[in-house]
Amino acid sequence: MSVEYKQKNDVPDLYKILGLTNDVCKESDCDERIRKAYARKAKKYHPDKYPGKKDIVEIFELITMAYDVLKDEKQRNEYNQRLIVEKQACSDYLKLKKRYNDFADSIGELKEPSNEQKLSFKEQMKAINSKHGYDTSQETAIPANQAKKKLSSLAKERASQDVNLRPEKLFDDGRFDLGTFNAVFDKYHKKSDSSIMPHNGVPSAWNEPTNSMNFSSFDNLDNIYVDDNSRLDISRQMFGDIDFGSSLPKISKQDISDIGRADYVDGHKVLGDDYYKDLKSKISEREKDSDLFDKMKYGDYKKDTAGYGVLDQLGCDFSEIYLDKCLPGSLEEQVEKLMAERKKVIPPTEFQYLSAPVSSRTNGSVGR
């Protein structure tokens, strides 16, 4: 049974806690609006108005925490950067998830092409036929007797190929020899690289005095036709050397016997004299590192990514995670408890975002 997961926000929306949006930062009196919003919320949910209600105390602490971060311009700018990164990451994830769901739903469905697609296909076929000088009016159906003769001829040709092109068993009794195989492979594949490469010039018709490689152009399937029939599209052609695509010579049992075995095959599993000594040394180093990590505490871990972190590329400085200082460690458990009591005092429309998992509100780390 599939489970539908809801979006999880690792960064709490402090503006929403105060009944605002991040658009308030664009206003000239941003600080004053944040202060007034905090005053309204603090007055409405002050613990003195609800004596004995622990859930109200927790909500008041949450409102105060949001104001402590947003009232300072530096902390507010850092928080805005974090919020932008979080929303962008969530947006990318949801887009990918939607694309996957659409693809999964479309599997097995046969959609008829639209009229525009049919028209576009016909126009493209007409253009290709025109370039090749192909006249579709001359098309005629192949008679049934000729089709049967052609099919019979192809079947006979395929049967003869199965006999003539059957590979010889190079290893006696089917026993594969890795050393012999590697020696033959190295010999027949040890040559100059003949991979395809882009070429922006015209190949020379003359042999070079040096040992340079000659090239011959061939069609690039990504650029079959040129719109201008008066020129050759040299700038976008692909070239390969003249040996490109040539088949390797056929190997016989006698060739294998003459080549022998590769020397490096038999010795690759031989352990050196210092093998076990080096192994013990590495195990000892690993144990020391493990002990060191086990003794490390929260503040001992390095936060410096040497400029290679994701947030470093965004120009954000998160060397000091201010939310860690603002969120008490017990807030997660306390907020979970107050959810059951919330509807008794607070209208259902208030703080609906609090129904999301609160583990994201107590996590002040930048990355995981």
UniProtKB/Swiss-Prot annotation:
Q: Which residues form the signal peptide?
A: none
What keywords tag this UniProt record? Chaperone
| KW Transmembrane (keyword) present | no
Q: Identify this protein by name.
A: Putative J domain-containing protein R445
- Occurrences of domain J (ranges): 13-83
Does the UniProt entry include the keyword Kinase? Answer: no
List, alphabetically, the PROSITE patterns matched.
DNAJ_1, DNAJ_2
> Which SUPFAM superfamilies does the entry link to?
Chaperone J-domain
Pfam families in the record: DnaJ (PF00226)
Instruction: Recall the taxonomic lineage recorded for the source organism.
Output: Viruses, Varidnaviria, Bamfordvirae, Nucleocytoviricota, Megaviricetes
Q: Which InterPro entries match?
A: DjlA_DnaK_co-chaperone, DnaJ_domain, DnaJ_domain_CS, J_dom_sf
